[in-house]
From Swiss-Prot:
It catalyses: 5-O-(1-carboxyvinyl)-3-phosphoshikimate = chorismate + phosphate. Keywords: Amino-acid biosynthesis, Aromatic amino acid biosynthesis, FAD, Flavoprotein, FMN, Lyase, NADP. NADP(+) binds at residues 40, 46. It holds the Pfam family Chorismate_synt. Homotetramer. This is Chorismate synthase. The keyword NADP applies.
């Protein structure tokens, strides 16, 4: 089973991750992580922090001569901005100059609950770990599982279907057509857009909305469509609640900072439709093989993959740090106050797509390993190939 831990503060020296359970023999290079770290930093509406950092993973263990060796893989990503925060974020030495505490929580952030939960007299420690900067370490860690899946012929991609009121009003047939070539083809086309949209008119609207929000000191959220192609039938299980693949995918997606909603396929539209309008009918092709007319279920039925493209929809709320602050209060004086302002993005929905692609990779890799096993990637691949050949 693949599992990972991340460590590090937003303005500390480094972000660190340890990934355990990766089969031996997987070809792995730092660029397999760095390409997605760079993608995470892109997107119209990002803040000044992304102009400072150029995230690159330094792999420290678990790889020899370019191949995984079955032991835990560790890596570090240096925070360049640490040089500007050594006084405020020093691990051991008392600050050389007084450091002001942060006492006013931001509505919508972890500030309020985190300060009370951990008994801090300063919100700064909460901000440092709850920050979405942590997702750089997660994208790096999950990129290893992503490479494992890629080498098994399984591809992950995404695009943005909504930013604020700039949203798709009908199914994107262009996306469906691209997916015939694999989810990574979709990913590359989306990456050509500053907001990772496939519709140029919508892209223009979204960028104008981001400009408007930035001028107003406001923020924007949106919706990301995530797809996975090449999955075999039968990953997950209906036998027990905790083996249903959709539950694990939901947990991974909802662990992303600012993500508040998740659906598989057209779940919410399906919920208000007749069953005859929802379920994906079968037909037999000219070779007598069963096919589907539609994919409204999003590639999952009964907690298992059904051979269709996996389709997840991810709802990201607007970022909680507003340059035109909302109403709050001061913990020290217990009097009304404008909420704290922290350097932030106006819109991070494009980055959310990259993060969502990443966090589902270990879930899918573990589903593969649960079904097919293998201490080496060659063992896993052989068993997967035998299984898929039998299904043809």
């Amino acid at each position: 089973m693949i599992r990972y831990l991340t460590s590090g503060e937003s303005h500390g020296p480094s972000l660190v991750a340890i990934v355990e359970g990766v089969p031996a023999g997987l070809a792995l290079h730092p660029d397999d992580l760095n390409i997605h770290l760079q993608r995470r930093q892109q997107g119209y509406g990002r803040g000044n922090r992304m102009k400072i950092e150029s995230d690159k993973a330094e792999i420290l263990s678990g790889v020899r001569f370019g191949y995984t060796i079955g032991s835990p893989i560790s890596f570090a990503i240096k925070n360049k901005d640490w040089a500007n925060w050594t006084n405020k974020m020093n691990q051991f030495e008392n600050p050389s100059e007084p450091v002001a505490t942060i006492d006013i929580p931001r509505p919508g952030h972890a500030d309020f609950s985190g300060r009370i939960k951990y008994g801090f007299n300063d919100i700064r420690p909460v901000i440092e770990r709850s920050s979405a900067r942590e997702t750089a370490a997660r994208v790096g860690a999950c990129s290893i599982s992503r490479k494992f899946l890629h080498d098994l012929g399984i591809e992950i991609g995404s695009y943005v279907s909504a930013i604020g009121q700039a949203f798709e009003t009908e199914p994107n047939h262009h996306a469906v057509k691209i997916l015939e070539k694999g989810a990574e083809t979709l990913m590359h086309e989306a990456d050509e857009s500053p907001v990772r949209m496939l519709n140029k008119d919508l892209e223009k609207q979204a960028m104008e909305l981001i400009d408007t929000a930035k001028k107003a000191g406001d923020t924007l959220g949106g919706i990301v469509e995530v797809f996975v192609t090449g999955l075999p039938i039968g990953l997950g299980s209906y036998v027990q609640y905790d083996r249903r693949l959709g539950a694990d995918l939901g947990a991974a997606i909802l662990s992303i900072q600012a993500v508040k909603g998740f659906e598989i396929g057209h779940a919410f539209k399906n919920a208000v439709s007749f069953g005859s309008e929802v379920h994906d009918e079968f037909y037999l092709d000219k070779n007598g093989n069963p096919q589907r007319k539609t994919n409204r279920a999003g590639g999952l039925e009964g907690g298992m993959t059904n051979g269709e493209t996996l389709h997840l929809r991810v709802a990201m709320k607007p970022i909680a740090t507003l340059m035109s602050p909302l109403s709050s209060f001061d913990f020290k004086t217990m009097s009304p106050a404008a909420s704290h302002i922290e350097r932030s993005d106006t819109c991070a929905v494009p980055a959310c797509g990259v993060i969502a692609e990443s966090v589902i990779a270990p879930v899918l890799a573990n589903a593969i390993l649960e079904k097919f096993g293998g201490d080496t990637i060659n063992e896993t691949k052989l068993r997967l190939d035998n299984y898929t050949q039998k299904g043809k």
